[in-house]
Amino acid sequence: RWRLEIRAEDEERYMRGELVEPIQPIIFYIDRNTPEKYIDCIIEAVRDWRPAFEKAGFKNAIDARLAPTVEEDSDFSIYDSTYPFISWKISGQNNAYGPTPCEPRSGEIIACHIGIFCSVLNLEQKWYFAQCGANDPQAWNIELPDSLQYEQIKQVLTHEVGHTLGLEHNFLGSSHYSIDQLRDNDFLSQYSIGSSIMDYVRCNYALRPQDKVDLRNRRVRVGEYDKWAIEWGYRIFPGKDASEREKNRTLWNQEKQKDPSLHFSGRMDVRAQAEDLGNDHVMVNTQGIENLKYLCEHPDVWNVTDKTSLRVLQGRYEAVLEHYKQWVQHVLSHLGGKRLAEPDDENIYIPEKADYNKKVMSFIQAYICLLYTSEAADD
């Protein structure tokens, strides 16, 4: 974690529960080569972590600003790893990264460098088309509107900032909410589509074409798990020494862990899958596949007008196929699958219930067996 400390004169206020500013906040510097239209949303992505730090008792603990010029600060250098830096890279690679070197003896994060490859937007537009295209006709545009691109950049960067704060992937984050909750705009405004932006969950594919939700509620944001994790890692607990402070942290955490949405899993657990959504894979992924069918049956979606549109639509068609395979695999994983038992359970793992496996078999019949039987009959 970063070294966030409070001033001696603020300690009493902090322990009373008042928000105080850290001695040295975490400041990210933004590459001046970043397209100007994305700078504001990058700053917003970093500041999206502020509520989590407020849970830990800090205000204005994290921020972002444009990197200074030589005239503004002659000591600043993008090659100085002590400055947290967000670089914009011109590359065909569809990715971003956010490694965090630590001092091995203390665990203190001593540097970070986030990289965003410009082509990550190509991947994001494919995901949004396949996952939200049935609900949002904006996804049909060959070039997505700026409002969508801003949300995509924000989601990518917020995830990478989470890594630089010390958070690992939590693939259990997308497994807590029901399909009804994922279609409820008020619920989504409060909780997002998952409890953690550190999961590989992209968009809200539980939505039907007729569902009405805000743009921000079609994507994942900093969630309840993320806020808890930052509080667990950064809050200074009361105590006369380190041992007592750790004891108080443990007692606090034992109470918090009664909330399943704060649980973590990167281990073998059928609920902890990448690119999934919801607490019922059969139900949510059924809707996802129905949405793919909806897109495939609309000729306006596939209107080729020039070479650019041809390349974009080819990529989107491939994304449709990939999502079909992916969502089928999520469901198949429940056959013989197991989930991590609760801490008070004498078992380590619990096998998937037989009743749920019957639902899995019905899904297989509908979306694998009958699908291929129909194709064979057409041939």
Residues covered by each model-derived region:
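Short loop/turn segments at secondary-structure transitions that flank enzyme active sites
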Residues: 8, 34, 92-94, 118-122, ...
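The catalytic-center signature of Zn2+-dependent metalloproteases
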Residues: 66-89, 151-208
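Active-site-adjacent "gating/activation" loops or surface patches in catalytic cores
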Residues: 2-26, 86, 90-95, 99-143
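Short, solvent-exposed loop/turn and secondary-structure capping segments
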Residues: 39-42, 52, 98-100, 113-114, ...
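Short pre-active-site segment immediately N-terminal to the catalytic Zn-binding motif
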Residues: 140-156
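Conserved catalytic/binding loops enriched for acidic/polar residues
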Residues: 174-374, 379
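Fold-level signature of zinc-dependent metallopeptidase catalytic domains
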Residues: 1-76
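Generic, well-ordered alpha-helical scaffold segments in large soluble proteins
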Residues: 2-5, 41-48, 52-56, 152-156, ...
